């Protein structure tokens, strides 16, 4: 009888220990923050559902191509204080930009020397750039400007990452 009682007590203790260990592992799993699991790469033409705000705010590269489809592309950008995207025009496609964090100025116009449209931008602002409009976006604040951009059709090569603005400018031929 004493042996059975010791055996049952041991089984009870093992069960209790296993249960508490399982709870600890579960608690650790639920404590994972989204930023701990973000993967910065081009997810290609596969379906992709994600928190765009988390990705945009956590991106430390000047430009990261996050998704390149057949006819559309999504990039996220981190424009440092005093930097800009560089004056450019896209003749064959429109562009959508949304500011997630930071402040700056957007300029647009019909010619490289005529940027008559100028607006201040900040968190949650959207910018719609028609095909054929010259444009530039300037970070005139002391904090990074975090944004995402959608091109239709795509603008950059699959899996493009530019860690800095200088790297982006060196790759200008492909942009």
Spans of features found by a protein language model:
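Short acidic-glycine-tyrosine-enriched beta hairpin
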Residues: 111-131
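C-terminal motif of bacterial Sec signal peptides marking the signal peptidase cleavage site
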Residues: 17-20
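A short hydrophobic beta-strand segment most commonly corresponding to one strand
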Residues: 96, 143-158
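Short beta-strand His + acidic residue motifs that chelate non-heme Fe in jelly-roll/DSBH
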Residues: 87, 106-107, 129, 135-141
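Glycine- and acidic-residue-biased ligand/ion/polar-headgroup-sensing regions
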Residues: 92-111
